[in-house]
Regions:
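ATP-dependent carboxylate activation and anion-phosphoryl transfer catalytic cores
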Residues: 1-179
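Phosphate-binding active sites in nucleotide-utilizing proteins
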Residues: 12, 194-200, 214-220
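Glycine-rich phosphate/diphosphate-binding loops that line cofactor/substrate pockets in enzymes
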Residues: 171-183, 202-203, 242-248
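Short glycine-rich anion-binding loops that position phosphate/pyrophosphate groups of nucleotides
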Residues: 83, 188-190, 255-259
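Short internal beta-strands
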Residues: 184, 206-218
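Peripheral docking tails and interdomain loops at the edges
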Residues: 230-231, 239-309
Length: 309
């Protein structure tokens, strides 16, 4: 996600942000990180060049938002929006640059040269924007993220590291991070290889693993002791029973297929009722892992002004 301002002659890049969720999930439902943590500097430079060329070619006067996809070192342009985006307040606070105010003045004739604009990538901290999802108010709604936006708000976390910033954003969104207990894992076949390293890191942090049959088999074969539990409808006690009995601390569930989505709905509803954090993508699981790691250090509260002055 890129926010920029153009006066028709020059372009200022407000920030380049990396979504934690993959392309295909609505940007409003995805957490995002500033500065990006998994994009090469050469690719970021390519993104800057594309943004400037598009803004000038489209004769944009004011704000422009562009969404890119990044895969295997290649950059793909998804959409170009010649308008302000929902990330403008986040970027402005993270970089201490009043983008909306500057864009308003540019729109009525001001030049970007009149403003002392600093490069966005010189900020000495990490900022994370997290979506606030209303599933506790709508318990029958599917928690599976998709191109359809479901979030009703956003929060922001700032710190010196990604894990700490994401931890703060999670707390702001009302998601309490576990520090011990059992992690339930049930992932689709496409995610099984990617979950192994994440599961191993949870074990190193002291968590125990529990999973559905296929996922548990994969983890056990890779040297990770994993308890097997029934899916919904297979027998009792099943995973929903385990959640209701407060035996699960965190749920990682990436369903695929009609039966898996049925299970996901029952699992999601139970997690919401019992205040258990659930993540539905591998990338989100990795981010939560970083956040949990950072809980070993004391959280120091600072004002936004202290980060910039």
């Amino acid at each position: 996600d890129v926010d920029a301002i153009s006066d028709g002659k020059t372009v200022h890049i407000g920030a380049v942000m990396q979504h934690i969720e993959e392309a295909g999930i609505h940007s409003g439902d995805s957490a995002c990180v500033l500065p990006p943590y998994k994009i090469t500097s050469s690719s970021i430079e390519q993104i800057n060049i594309i943004t400037k060329k598009l803004a000038i070619k489209l004769n944009v006067i004011g704000l422009i938002n562009i969404q890119f996809a990044y895969k295997n070192g290649k950059v793909y342009t998804l959409e170009v929006n010649p308008r302000a985006s929902r990330t403008i307040p986040f970027v402005s606070k993270a970089t201490n640059t009043p983008l909306a105010k500057i864009a308003a003045q540019v729109s009525v004739g001001a030049s970007l040269d009149q403003f002392q604009l600093k490069p966005w990538d010189q900020i000495p901290h990490v900022a994370v924007k997290e979506a606030v999802l209303p599933f506790n108010k709508f318990p029958d709604e599917s928690i599976f993220l998709s191109p359809e936006m479901k979030s009703t708000g956003e929060v922001m976390g700032i710190s010196k590291s990604l894990g700490s910033a994401f931890k703060r954003a999670c707390i702001g969104a009302g998601n309490m991070l576990p520090i011990s207990g059992k992690v339930f894992i049930s992932v689709n076949d496409m995610d099984k290889l990617n979950i192994i390293s994440i599961a191993r890191d949870f074990v190193e942090l002291g968590f125990k693993l529990i999973g559905t049959e296929n996922t548990a088999n994969v983890l056990n074969k890779n040297g990770l002791s994993t308890q097997c539990v029934f899916k919904v409808g297979e027998g009792r006690p099943n995973i929903v029973d385990e959640i209701k009995n407060k035996k699960i601390s965190l749920v990682i569930n990436t369903p695929m297929g009609s039966q898996s989505r049925y299970d996901e709905k029952a699992i999601g509803r139970s997690c919401i009722k019992n205040g258990i954090l659930i993540v539905t993508t591998i990338s989100a699981a990795s981010a939560v892992l970083r956040a949990i790691r950072s809980t070993s250090t004391k959280t120091k509260v600072r004002s936004l002004q202290e980060y910039h002055y």
